Amino acid sequence: MKKSRFIVGFIVAVVLGGGALLWGPTLLAEGDNVNMQLAKLNFILRTVRDNYVDVPDPSKLLEGAIRGMLEELDPHSVYIPPEDQKRINETFRGEFEGVGITFSIQNKWLTVVSPIPGTPADRLGIRAGDRIIKINNVSAYGITNDQVFEKLRGPKGTSVDVTIARPGINDPIDFTIVRDTIPIYSVAASFLMHDGQTGYVRINQFTATTDHEVEQALDSLRTQGMRRLLLDLRSNPGGYLDQAWKVADLFMPRKDMMLVYTKGRTARSNQEFYSTGRGAKYDFPVIVLINHGSASASEIVSGAIQDHDRGLVIGEVSFGKGLVQTPYPLPDGSAVRITTARYYTPSGRLIQRPYDKGIAEYIAEGYDDTGEEAPPDTTPREVYHTDHGRMVYGGGGISPDSTVKSPRGTATTARLLSQRLYFECAADYAAKHPELATNFERFLSGFQVPDEMLTELRALAKERKVQIVEDEWTKDLDFTKSNLKGELANVLFNDRNLYHAVRIESDAQVLTAITLFGQANQMAQ
């Protein structure tokens, strides 16, 4: 294999000619069988076009054929339509041009979940809970997510008029928002916990700026007195491979430590990535949190830390995605994302789960708890060893050093979450109690969700015809209170750090991790 310490071009390459080759003479020359199959596809397309009972859309037929072809490969080789690819590019580039809000559609109304700090919407005073009732003097009732993107995003320097209904204020408020470049942060939260020594960093996904964001967060936390780190990769679906190894690099104590390697059919698919030594300054104990939703790049980071005994991994078995995709853009703005390699952790583990039973079962198994109660050595998985000789396992995600399951909410909680009723209740309560926003420390330590707020949540659920089953409500009452307080903190203070600071107060996985820093400290020596 070729040793590389730099971003590998094939992972993020823009290969405009790659798509065209699928229809070029190189493919046709590979054998008569391919020619026959292409002729068959062409015949079927013409036959459907000329004889189907309704007039079909040929482009949709071809897109369906492309999807069907890729489904024969693996669950992660996919076709991406132009509009979806445009948004994916914006997300992973780390910025887009627009007004700067996160939003949801609630009861058919466009509702601001939070203005992104420092953006045009934030500077104008738009708040969480504001309901956008008009865009450019046209009603926004019944608007779809795609229409929101179309109307609110646009070139920097252009403007859009919005009319807002604000809880607690009778008359609508008009704003003219001048669009700007909006950053998309992959570090969702970074703060010093209440004990004054534990840093908490949560990464949502691995985009083009993640390693710089994490490094800035670590430097800032060290100046605040951080002596140990809780790295939260739960529900992080992954992202760029180069960002995964660069983040892992931040936690390695010296140069030339293997971080991850890839194997594929071509020479450029076979790569090794090693530490650069820049992580030597971050010599504090580390605990990584993972769950069933931690995949791909998240597993590269947690696998490297675990294999080198750099820290502990706590939580649930990760998803188990050990495949690397290369995007091949097409001329119309769409793309095909093809699996070109498998990746392996430093000890040699391939953590990809089998996917021969179909995509639906593959996804379901990734979130299944089956087998987690059994001791690891009773499972039929390949055994590998860390630098210090600890046993770790391949073929089914990253197994945590200590399993702590996250509570599985009831169906009642799932319904309340899906309708964003916790947020809506918090926004209404914040409008009635603005005095709560004067001091976060007082809010964090002193505020308890009152019965009044719980009553309002139940009334809201009844109004929206969301069923509450009484024994499920009782079972999840602590979660309900924690979520309401977290959403209230976000609305009052417009700071996602504060939302997470509230939520982790009662987080079983976080609380268990805190008790295990003694072990993590021994590893860091």
Which residues fall in each region the model found?
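Residue-level recognition of conserved beta-strand edge/terminus positions
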Residues: 135-136, 165, 339, 354, ...
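Positively charged n-region of N-terminal signal peptides that target proteins for export
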Residues: 1-5
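Hydrophobic membrane-insertion alpha-helices, especially the h-region
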Residues: 8-23
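Extended, small/polar residue-biased N-terminal targeting/export presequences
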Residues: 52-113, 159-189, 256, 503-514, ...
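Polar, glycine-rich mid-to-C-terminal structural blocks
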Residues: 297, 309, 316, 320-382
